[in-house]
């Protein structure tokens, strides 16, 4: 188990100065002053870093648990099975992976050593849970693609058996790749223990470290990025096309032309009604113009890239170059930037959804003595919210009225204000 550096360390043929571990390439020897704070400034920096890591860990645990509870206790939210699965994976990351990352990254734990088994478990959890989370995000994007671009096919084929099958496939593929870190090659030489700060993804004695590095980056990052970008681009095109097909705001009687032929009225399939009786709909110019839809998708895809791109580039570069010196601060930064994905995922895939938020408010109202009122959904909400409701398969009832082109003029006649001199329409 983990031990303090002051206690005797178990080694076979090498001293602690020869420790070199990981998956991809050689690592510098353990410096004699590991974990020693040299100044008050560095101590404050280390303390701030520890605070940020612990905060991210707590946010990941609480936020993902909250979204899971909201989905589990509401039958109408069962359609978010993949979102619930993502939150469950991120909870595992918050419980198993992130605490080990704190021990490995923080100088306050610089005197801690791992046994070889413990270090292997840490490396295994890194590959397994990271791949599991990324695969689930990819599955969510593909599900949204089929729901919006191919809705009929989605309704027929998206069954509970298919959802369970996809989840089992995700777990199997993640486990298969992670097992390579345990049985693929002996990455630790003849060592029997290792400093926790040197238990890293990018170090290995094996000549296959470069092959695994490329495989890890292509399968776990490059392929998911291509899939996510492609499907959300298709979703954007469909959303843009649907918005442009919506009829803009109907002019009032005062704005209408006073002279109209009877033939125009007969051929028209739309009854002239005032905007006061017309349901308030967001026009395409207000909802999708100016690149706002692209900006929303940029937030979703950009969050994934910001969290994971530096992580994979760093470890790929370190493994291919075989660098003997690892910049510790940079490695900690890219690792925890990647781990921050576990804390922000529930916001991007759960809390931005109005139905899940409302369910969380209801749950809070049940837990506290003072009731919390849920305000009505606003039709004039932010574009990001409206677009996310579209791609996340939710919308308020007031946002789902049929368009004019599909409405029967006879059915709307009783709801329209009678306009003086209006010529009644005849059915085609």
From Swiss-Prot:
- Positions of transmembrane segments: 47-67, 94-114, 121-141, 163-183, 211-231, 294-314
- Stretches assigned to the Extracellular side: 1-46, 115-120, 184-210, 315-428
Q: Name one GO cellular component term.
A: endosome
- Its GO biological process terms? G protein-coupled receptor signaling pathway
Q: How does it sit in the membrane?
A: Multi-pass membrane protein
Q: Which residues lie on this side of the membrane: Cytoplasmic?
A: 68-93, 142-162, 232-293
Point out the glycosylated residues in this chain.
Answer: 18
Polar residues bias spans: 398-414
Record localization? Cell membrane
Stretch list, region Disordered? 398-428
Single GO MF descriptor: G protein-coupled receptor activity
Q: Which UniProt keywords apply?
A: Cell membrane, G-protein coupled receptor, Glycoprotein, Membrane, Receptor, Transducer, Transmembrane, Transmembrane helix
Alphabetical list of Gene3D superfamilies matching this protein: Rhodopsin 7-helix transmembrane proteins (1.20.1070.10)
Concerning its family, UniProt says: Belongs to the G-protein coupled receptor 1 family.
Would you tell me the protein name for this molecule?
Probable G-protein coupled receptor
Source organism? Oryzias latipes (Japanese rice fish)
């Amino acid at each position: 188990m983990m031990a303090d550096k002051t206690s005797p360390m178990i080694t076979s043929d090498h001293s602690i100065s020869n420790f070199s571990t990981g998956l991809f390439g050689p690592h510098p020897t353990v410096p004699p002053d590991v974990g020693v704070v040299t100044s008050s400034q560095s101590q404050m920096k280390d303390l701030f870093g520890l605070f940020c890591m612990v905060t991210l860990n707590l946010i990941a645990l609480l936020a993902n648990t909250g979204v899971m509870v909201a989905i589990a206790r509401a039958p109408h939210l069962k359609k978010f099975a993949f979102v619930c699965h993502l939150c469950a994976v991120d909870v595992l990351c918050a419980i198993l992976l992130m605490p080990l990352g704190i021990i490995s990254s923080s100088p306050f734990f610089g005197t801690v050593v791992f046994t070889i088994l413990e270090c292997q478990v840490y490396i295994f959890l890194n590959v397994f849970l990271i791949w599991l989370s990324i695969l689930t995000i990819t599955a969510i994007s593909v599900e949204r693609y089929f729901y919006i671009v191919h809705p009929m096919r989605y309704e027929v084929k998206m069954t509970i058996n298919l959802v369970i099958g996809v989840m089992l496939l995700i777990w199997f593929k993640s486990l298969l790749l992670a097992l390579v870190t345990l049985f693929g090659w002996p990455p630790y030489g003849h060592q029997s223990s290792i400093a926790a700060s040197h238990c890293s993804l990018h170090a290995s004695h094996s000549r296959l470290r470069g092959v695994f590095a490329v495989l890890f980056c292509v399968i776990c990052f490059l392929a998911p990025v291509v899939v996510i970008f492609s499907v959300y681009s298709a979703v954007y095109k469909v959303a843009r096309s649907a918005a442009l097909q919506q009829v803009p705001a109907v002019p009032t009687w005062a704005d209408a032309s006073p002279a109209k032929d009877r033939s125009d009225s007969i051929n028209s399939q739309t009854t002239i009604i005032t905007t006061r009786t017309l349901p308030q709909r967001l026009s395409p110019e207000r909802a999708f113009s100016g690149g706002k839809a692209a900006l929303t998708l940029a937030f979703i895809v950009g969050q994934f890239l910001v969290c994971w791109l530096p992580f994979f580039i760093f470890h790929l570069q370190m493994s291919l170059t075989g660098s003997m010196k690892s910049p510790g601060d940079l490695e900690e930064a890219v690792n925890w930037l990647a781990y921050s994905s576990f804390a922000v995922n529930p916001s991007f895939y759960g809390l931005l959804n109005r139905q899940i938020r409302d369910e969380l408010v209801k749950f809070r109202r049940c837990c506290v003595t003072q009731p919390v009122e849920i305000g009505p959904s606003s039709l004039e909400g932010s574009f990001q919210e409206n677009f996310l409701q579209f791609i996340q398969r939710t919308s308020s009832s007031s946002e789902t009225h049929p368009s004019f082109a599909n409405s029967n003029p006879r059915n709307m006649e009783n709801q329209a204000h009678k306009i003086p001199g209006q010529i009644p329409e005849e059915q085609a």
